[in-house]
């Protein structure tokens, strides 16, 4: 009998059947948790269920599984506390008013760290509680942050360390905020603005009442004696005002920013679709509070609005550049350079700093004669609503990709500028080049001058007064000036080793389990959870957290929990502890060739030809003069072992230079040996993939007599788009076309592929010395047949459905994977585990919701059996080509016109005048 696990009856259990598939039996009856990881010895089957081992003695109808009680004598070392290096676990930084110190979040704990010397001080570090999004409250000596100490997000206000003693933190609005995505404080530290997952923009007043102040003063007077006991304790919940300013119906608002006087709040508001956003603002303080104002109209993607520190301007980033760039291969046009910062003068009485000046611009390095800095505002914001949108002006900088816009001292701005690079990372000559990282730039608004502050960084934070920046660069934290490039004297390197954080794995896993549950509940595509009692599911699995003893086990548990969603794209990636120095590890070296052992010699049987259009698909032996049949004898002067071969000698050699010694074919020690220097590949999959595609194209050519073109699309991302366009022009001109999406890993560009394949030939462009070209160009000339299988997934499901719904052509193969509830982004839990949430569900007029968990059925079912595979037969390709040729016979391919019936363009003879012969 054949034993296997299946959940076809709703829950995973152990089954068996006869070799022909008959006599199906169920051997276990687990109704709550899945039976998993079955293994057998030919008679007995062992498996795990809910963290316990179970054994089935045989596959007879009456066999009853029984639990194995395994007692471990040693401690579960994976649950012991351990220390982590802070530099590898920084989750957020908030700089104080002057840039002297920062509040640093390290793996869910919050620490106060002076930049130059001084000790680190723990503000809050409670095992099982995660702290996020710290914000300084002006110069009040307090810091706000988001905590989940009560099981839902709340705001907590903590006092910075001081000599008079510790004061307990205050907790506000627990359970009233949803999942907080962003939080900013006004300059005075009296209010917080929060963006929630459900589209709400909330205002929270954080000022203390008289009773609260007296209680905290009393706590502070207890002195240093009780200080250590109070550190890390839970905050006291107090009442507060939470005001909903606005609610978005198209997803969360983001990029919140207060004006320098604290009277105005601006943000980026989502529009219909996935890219349109508009800048909005509202007066939230003073006697003239009024309705929300639209700064921009939502036609473009506008984001990251900020007020300049003088209060005269609003700046934002906008993707509204429409200077098309021609595609060098297909002639298509795209907009890769669409982003630029823009400036809005808030009052018509304020001149644009970019307008022409009758006095001209100052000489380089000189002072502006109009005295911009002297006339700058005091931070009070005056908004003239009439004509606001018409006062939007682009910055005089090159269009590129920008992010992280912030105001700094002197009325200037800083931002990150990103290089334009390819989706596959092949833009830069050296794969290890860091030039794909952003550059931090400063713009002096008064002088309209741009300067570079820091090159190649990760992210940065700004001090409260805008004079200093804290820059994160691959684990190194440093403070630099905000308005000019730093030097040795002005740059302060911040020693993160002063932060000592002990991780309690058991407490972290409990917190991360609950946090994962909240994230799923907040972001799952259906608010009703498709009928699932999510709280009951979490309660069912929560006791199993106490059995977890490693990050991998915790990730495995979360996979079971997310599996209860019955939905695709619910992934879990395990955390890594990263304690201690990183292990020295280099990738295996690969030669891009197949070697076989013949009579104790390692012979080059085949050098993969590769593809010159793919820089990753080239064998190191190509062009070296080594031919198939040569014998590899030495690697870096070390003899190749006849038994283990060259691979142990190439361990760790990937990406570095090695010397290979070859003997001519048939020679073991004599003959003229040849030494070559090569750089082994770290990954030969692109090379083998291109060879795989070339072989199948040859099969299609042979089966069709050259009448069928062949395209394979490995995924619906950057590599799939590249592969599709790599061969489209050469294959689409043939009478029929096979589009192979077997094994397609999904992505998001199926619409682009469909646009190409749905082009119709309406006519021909005829020229004198070349073959006619179809209009539309690169359109299929005849029938198109799709190939799909059970590994055609996600956006591969989508394009297979599109083939059928649009009538592009029949689908041959197997039913597709069936996963069309996509994800957007990834969520990192407190312990470092990463999860994804199914957020975007696909619905089709013809299928409804049924493609999810079902897939798309082919028009012609074809299966490549293991025997076909072993004997080199291509059953699915055979059927696809046969069907394409049948359709071609019924509907011949479009052909250019014959060179006949050419119009006569000779000038007609002038007729006689009227009344004359």
Q: For each of these PLM feature ranges, what is it?
A:
Residues 23-28, 80-82, 121-124, 168-173, ...:
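A short beta-strand motif characteristic of beta-propeller blades
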Residues 42-43, 98-100, 139-141, 188-190, ...:
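Short coil/turn segments that connect the beta-strands within blades of beta-propeller domains
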Residues 546-603, 671-696, 881-916:
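Extended, small/polar residue-biased N-terminal targeting/export presequences
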Residues 586-642, 840-841:
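PDZ/PDZ-like domain segments forming the peptide/carboxylate-binding groove
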Residues 18-22, 58-61, 115-118, 160-164, ...:
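Short loop/turn segments that connect beta-strands within beta-propeller blades
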Residues 611-620, 633, 638-639, 644-830, ...:
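Cleft-lining beta-strand/loop regions that shape enzyme active-site pockets
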Residues 1-15, 29-36, 46-58, 71-78, ...:
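A flexible loop/linker signature enriched in serine peptidases of the S9 family
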């Amino acid at each position: 009998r054949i034993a296997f696990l299946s959940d076809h009856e709703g829950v995973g259990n152990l089954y068996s059947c006869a070799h022909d598939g008959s006599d199906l039996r169920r051997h276990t009856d687990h109704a709550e948790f899945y039976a998993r990881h079955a293994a057998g010895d030919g008679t007995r089957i062992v498996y795990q269920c809910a963290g316990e081992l179970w054994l089935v003695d045989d596959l007879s109808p009456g066999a009853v599984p029984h639990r194995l009680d395994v007692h471990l004598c040693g401690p579960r070392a994976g649950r012991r506390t351990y220390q982590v290096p802070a530099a590898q676990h920084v989750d957020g930084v908030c700089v104080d008013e002057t840039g002297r110190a920062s509040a640093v979040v390290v793996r869910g704990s919050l620490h106060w760290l002076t930049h130059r010397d001084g000790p680190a001080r723990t503000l809050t570090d409670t095992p099982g509680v995660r702290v996020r999004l710290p914000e300084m409250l002006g110069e009040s000596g307090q810091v706000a942050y988001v905590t989940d100490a009560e099981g839902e997000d709340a705001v907590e206000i903590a006092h910075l360390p001081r000599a008079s003693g510790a004061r307990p933190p205050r907790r506000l609005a627990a359970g009233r905020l949803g999942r907080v995505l962003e939080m900013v404080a006004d300059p005075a530290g009296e209010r917080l603005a929060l963006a929630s997952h459900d589209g709400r923009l909330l205002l929270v007043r954080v000022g203390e009442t008289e009773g609260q102040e007296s209680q905290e003063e009393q706590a502070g007077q207890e002195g240093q004696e009780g200080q250590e006991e109070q550190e890390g304790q839970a905050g006291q919940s107090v009442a507060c005002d939470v005001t909903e300013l606005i609610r978005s119906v198209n997803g969360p608002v983001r990029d919140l920013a207060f004006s320098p006087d604290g009277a105005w709040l601006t943000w980026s508001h989502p529009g219909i679709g996935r890219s349109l956003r508009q800048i909005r603002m509202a007066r939230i303080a003073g006697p003239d509070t009024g309705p929300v104002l639209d700064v921009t109209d939502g036609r473009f993607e506008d984001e990251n609005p900020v007020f300049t520190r003088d209060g005269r301007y609003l700046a934002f980033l906008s993707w509204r550049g429409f200077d098309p760039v021609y595609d060098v291969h297909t002639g298509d046009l795209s907009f890769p350079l669409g982003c630029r910062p823009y400036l809005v003068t808030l009052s018509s009485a304020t001149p644009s700093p970019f307008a022409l000046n009758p006095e001209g611009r100052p000489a380089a390095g000189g002072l502006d004669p109009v005295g911009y800095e002297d006339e700058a505002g005091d931070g009070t914001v005056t908004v003239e609503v009439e004509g606001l949108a018409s006062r939007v002006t682009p910055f005089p900088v090159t269009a590129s990709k920008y992010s992280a816009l912030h105001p700094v001292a002197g009325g200037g701005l800083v931002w990150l500028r990103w290089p334009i690079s390819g989706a596959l990372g092949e833009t830069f000559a050296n794969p290890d080049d860091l030039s794909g990282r952003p550059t931090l730039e400063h713009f002096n608004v008064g002088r309209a001058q741009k300067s570079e502050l820091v090159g190649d960084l990760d992210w940065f934070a700004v001090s409260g007064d805008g004079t200093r920046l804290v820059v994160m660069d691959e684990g190194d934290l440093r403070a630099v000036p905000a308005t000019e490039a730093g030097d040795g004297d002005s740059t302060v390197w911040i020693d993160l080793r002063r932060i000592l954080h002990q991780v309690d794995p058991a407490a972290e896993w409990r917190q991360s389990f609950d946090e994962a549950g909240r994230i799923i509940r907040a972001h799952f595509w259906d608010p009703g959870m498709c009928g699932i009692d999510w709280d009951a599911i979490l309660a069912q699995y929560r006791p199993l957290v106490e059995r977890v003893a490693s990050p991998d086990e915790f990730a495995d548990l979360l996979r079971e929990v997310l599996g209860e969603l019955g939905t695709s794209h619910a992934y879990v990636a395990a955390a890594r502890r990263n304690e201690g120095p990183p292990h020295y590890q280099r990738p295996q070296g690969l030669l891009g060739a197949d070697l076989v052992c013949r009579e104790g010699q390692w012979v080059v049987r085949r050098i993969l030809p590769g593809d010159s259009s793919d820089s990753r698909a080239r064998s190191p032996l190509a062009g070296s003069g080594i031919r198939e049949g040569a014998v590899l004898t030495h690697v870096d002067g070390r003899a190749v072992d006849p038994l283990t071969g060259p691979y142990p000698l190439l361990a760790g050699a990937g990406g570095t230079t090695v010397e290979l010694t070859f003997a001519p074919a048939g020679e073991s020690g004599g003959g003229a040996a040849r030494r070559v220097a090569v750089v082994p590949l770290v990954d030969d999959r692109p090379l083998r993939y291109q060879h795989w595609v070339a072989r199948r194209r040859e099969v299609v050519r042979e089966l069709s007599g050259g009448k069928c073109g062949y395209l394979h699309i490995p995924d619906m991302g950057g590599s799939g788009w590249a592969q599709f366009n790599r061969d489209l022009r050469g294959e689409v001109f043939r009478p029929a076309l096979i589009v192979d999406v077997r094994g397609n890993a999904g992505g998001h560009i199926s619409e682009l592929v469909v646009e190409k394949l749905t082009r119709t030939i309406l006519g021909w462009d005829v020229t004198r010395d070349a073959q006619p070209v179809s209009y539309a160009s690169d359109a299929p000339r005849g029938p198109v047949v799709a190939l799909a299988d059970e590994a055609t997934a996600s956006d591969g499901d989508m394009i297979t459905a599109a083939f059928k719904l649009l009538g592009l052509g029949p689908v041959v193969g197997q039913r597709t994977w069936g996963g069309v509830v996509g994800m957007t982004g990834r969520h990192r839990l407190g312990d470092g585990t990463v999860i994804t949430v199914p957020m975007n569900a696909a619905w089709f007029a013809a299928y409804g919701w049924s493609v999810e968990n079902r897939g798309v059925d082919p028009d012609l079912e074809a299966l490549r059996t293991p025997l076909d595979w072993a004997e080199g037969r291509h059953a699915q390709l055979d059927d696809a080509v046969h069907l394409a040729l049948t359709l071609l016979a019924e509907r011949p391919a479009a052909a250019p016109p014959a060179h006949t019936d050419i119009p006569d363009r000779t000038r007609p003879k002038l007729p006689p005048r009227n009344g004359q012969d």
